[in-house]
Each structure stands twice: as structure tokens, then as C-alpha cells.
């Protein structure tokens, strides 16, 4: 079954262009799996999906993971629709729409906004958790602790003398403004170039590939995911350490946390949909020097103003070392989106009897690992039509 939107040419009389096609006809054919839907950044239903994502986040803060997943799934489905939802008829027959979600959509159609979401945005706990989790190294568990201590804002947490902070959280506070401001495509490209040049000094023929939202065509992100793979050579555990040392020597490394590989040859992919991967990797914060701007002001400024003129920005970077034979799987996993990756794994298991993770694909029926040299081959193994990275913004 191909649950793609009929964009003409499939021989059915009803498959006109999406404009002419009745929304309810489209809705009935939408797959429950993001890996069978094209989802570009062109979202006709932003007012609905924004609301559902706030709901999902609130559920996450309350650690109600099932409800969180349901709201996220519904948002993802609405993102894929080639038309704007204007009546409840439009969503008839869509998969994965819970009553919870339906109520929110209905109210937005009727009132233009959701009272439920307004409530969340005004909720003291939600607002505090939203602030806390925007700090690098702070998750729901830590937020919970800080909230119980009576803290409500990043400012208050920063000023608190009684917090035991991890190395990660200290860096998160130290570079908070920079990290919270997000990363532009230009900044991501500049970071990629720095890493490419540094890697080339260690291994000239290694490949550095940007993944994540930027590979999916997003103009902004909150970090830069870079995969480093070395086609010509067996794995070298030292490559990452050498690259990190060189970045340090150049004075470009503000923070690093290296995790060694935990990959076990021959082990089956984890059946957990959200399992982390086992690659050797470094979570880092890089010092990105800003392009020199008009310097006339700087020359005349007194020493006290110099603090204002910080000529660099802290940027979050993940460096991931991927063995060449696992590269296609790593690229597919790290390109995302998160929802796309989750649904791809779910599809593999539920529809194909296969286990997929960021390292490999295992066919449970045949009892073999399926190798792949490209993302296209992985889609092929799964019997899926290929989706370009920019069509995976689920």
C-alpha cells in the first residue's frame, strides 16, 4: 500500500492536483507512518501544529510520555497535509487523532485559538520547565528538582548558591545567551568548515557530513550534528581525540564531553524505538568567531565597553564517528526528524519484521543483517519509496 498523497498521474480519475482533490479523500489515504508521508517545511497547519507541540511538551514536563507521543504524532500528521484544515470534515479519517487532539483542533477552527494551550502557556510550572530545559544539560528531572526548590527562572537558577551543577550545566549557564539564540544555516556552515579543516589535518580523506535539521533544509537549529567517517581505513579510536585536541590547540573548544563507542559487533539493533546509538562521539561547544564587522566603533571604545564587543559566539556541536559500513544508517538516523526516525523503526518492526537502528538493519525472518551503501538502499530494503531529506520534516 502506498499511502502517498496522489499528486496526479496515478491513473485514478480523482487524482488531480491537491487543490482540486477533496481534503477528506486525501485524509483517508494518509499513512500512520511518517516514513510513508512527504513532509516538507511548507506547513499549511502551523497554528494547529504549534498548539499540539506545546501540548506535547507540557505532557513531557509531566512525564506523561504516552500522551506526549500522541500529540507529537498528530502534529506530524497535520504537517504532512497538502492543504489547510478549515473544518472538522477535513480531518475525518486521519490516523492517530485522539479525542484530546480533536478537541484542540476543533476549538482552534471555531475560536482561532485553544483555551487549553493558553492555559498551558500561563501555567507557572510549564513556564519554569520551559526555561530550565532551555539550558544545555538540564532535562525534566533537574527541572523538577529546581522547581521544588522554589526556583522559577534561568536567572534565579544561575544566581542560586545551593545548586550542584554538572560540568555540562555549568557550561550551559556560562554560554546561555549564545546557546539559547539558536544556530543559523550560515553559522552551521562556518562550523562545518572549521571541523572539516581540522579533520583534514588528521585524516585527509575522511568525510564530514552535516546531518540534523540543516540537512533537511531548515534555516535554523539549536546545534550542529556532524558525522565523520573514514572510507579508506579501519576504525581509529584516536581520530576523535586528535580532532578534539587540535580544536583545543586552536583555542576553539569551550566544552567537550567524549563518549567512547559502545557498539557490539553482531548484537541486534535495540527494539526500543527511542534507543540512543553506540557511536563514539563528542558533545562540544565550539567558539565561532564572527565575521569582522565595521571596526570604527571598536577603535574608540574604552576598556569598559570591550565586554560588549564579544567577537565570537558559542555553538553546540555533536561530532559523531561512524564506521564507513554503518554510515548510511547513521546518516539516515541523524538526519531525522525525530518523529521520522521513530516511525521508520516502528514501520520496520511492525510492517517488515525488521529491526532498525542508527547502525544496522536486521531481518528477523531471514536472520541476517542487511548492508547498505546509501539511504536509498535502506528505503529499498524496507520496501519504501525514497524520501529526500527535505521531505522528512515530520
What spans do the regions from the language model cover?
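Structure-specific DNA junction-binding interface
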Residues: 1-121, 141, 162-394
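Generic anion/oxyanion-binding catalytic loop in active/binding sites
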Residues: 60, 132, 146
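Low-complexity, Ser/Pro/Thr/Glu/Lys-rich regulatory segments of predominantly eukaryotic nuclear proteins
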Residues: 126-129
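Catalytic cores of DNA base-excision repair glycosylases
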Residues: 134-136
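Fungal eukaryote-biased detector of long internal structured cores
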Residues: 141-143, 149
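Class I SAM-dependent methyltransferase SAM-binding "motif I" and its flanking Rossmann-like core
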Residues: 157
Amino acid at each position: 500500500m502506498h499511502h502517498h498523497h496522489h499528486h496526479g498521474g496515478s491513473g485514478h480519475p480523482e487524482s488531480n492536483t491537491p487543490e482540486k482533490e477533496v481534503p477528506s479523500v486525501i485524509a483517508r489515504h494518509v499513512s500512520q507512518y511518517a516514513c510513508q508521508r512527504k513532509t516538507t517545511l511548507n506547513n499549511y497547519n502551523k497554528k494547529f501544529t504549534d498548539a499540539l507541540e506545546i501540548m506535547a511538551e507540557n505532557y513531557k514536563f509531566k512525564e506523561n510520555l504516552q500522551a506526549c507521543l500522541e500529540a507529537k504524532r498528530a502534529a506530524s500528521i497535520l504537517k504532512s497535509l497538502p492543504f489547510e484544515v478549515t473544518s472538522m470534515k477535513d480531518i475525518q479519517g486521519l490516523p492517530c487523532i485522539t479525542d484530546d487532539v480533536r478537541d484542540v483542533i476543533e476549538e482552534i477552527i471555531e475560536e482561532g485559538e485553544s483555551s487549553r494551550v493558553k492555559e498551558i502557556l500561563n501555567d507557572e510550572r510549564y513556564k519554569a520547565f520551559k526555561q530550565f530545559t532551555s539550558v544545555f544539560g538540564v532535562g525534566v528531572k533537574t527541572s523538577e528538582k529546581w522547581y521544588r526548590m522554589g526556583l522559577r527562572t534561568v536567572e534565579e537558577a544561575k544566581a542560586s548558591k545551593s545548586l550542584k551543577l554538572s560540568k555540562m550545566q555549568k557550561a550551559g549557564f556560562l554560554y546561555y545567551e549564545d546557546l539559547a539564540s539558536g544556530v543559523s544555516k550560515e553559522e552551521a556552515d562556518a562550523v562545518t568548515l572549521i571541523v572539516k579543516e581540522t579533520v583534514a589535518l588528521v585524516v585527509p580523506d575522511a568525510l564530514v557530513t552535516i546531518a540534523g535539521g540543516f540537512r533537511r533544509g531548515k534555516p535554523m537549529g539549536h546545534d550542529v550534528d556532524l558525522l565523520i567517517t573514514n572510507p579508506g581505513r579501519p576504525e581509529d579510536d584516536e581520530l576523535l581525540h586528535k580532532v578534539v585536541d587540535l580544536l583545543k590547540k586552536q583555542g576553539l573548544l569551550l566544552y567537550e564531553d567524549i563518549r567512547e563507542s559502545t557498539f557490539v559487533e553482531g548484537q541486534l539493533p535495540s527494539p526500543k524505538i527511542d534507543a540512543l546509538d553506540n557511536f563514539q562521539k563528542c558533545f562540544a561547544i565550539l567558539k565561532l568567531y564572527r565575521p569582522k564587522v565595521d571596526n570604527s566603533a571598536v577603535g574608540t571604545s574604552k576598556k569598559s565597553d570591550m565586554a560588549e564587543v564579544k567577537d565570537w559566539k558559542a555553538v553546540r556541536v555533536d561530532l559523531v564517528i561512524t564506521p564507513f559500513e554503518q554510515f548510511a544508517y547513521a546518516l539516515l538516523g541523524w538526519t531525522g526528524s525525530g518523529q521520522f526516525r521513530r516511525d521508520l523503526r516502528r514501520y520496520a518492526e511492525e510492517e517488515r519484521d525488521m529491526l532498525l537502528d542508527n547502525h544496522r538493519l536486521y531481518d528477523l525472518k531471514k536472520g541476517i543483517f542487511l548492508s547498505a551503501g546509501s539511504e536509498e538502499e535502506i528505503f529499498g530494503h524496507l520496501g519504501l519509496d525514497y524520501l529526500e531529506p527535505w521531505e522528512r520534516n515530520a
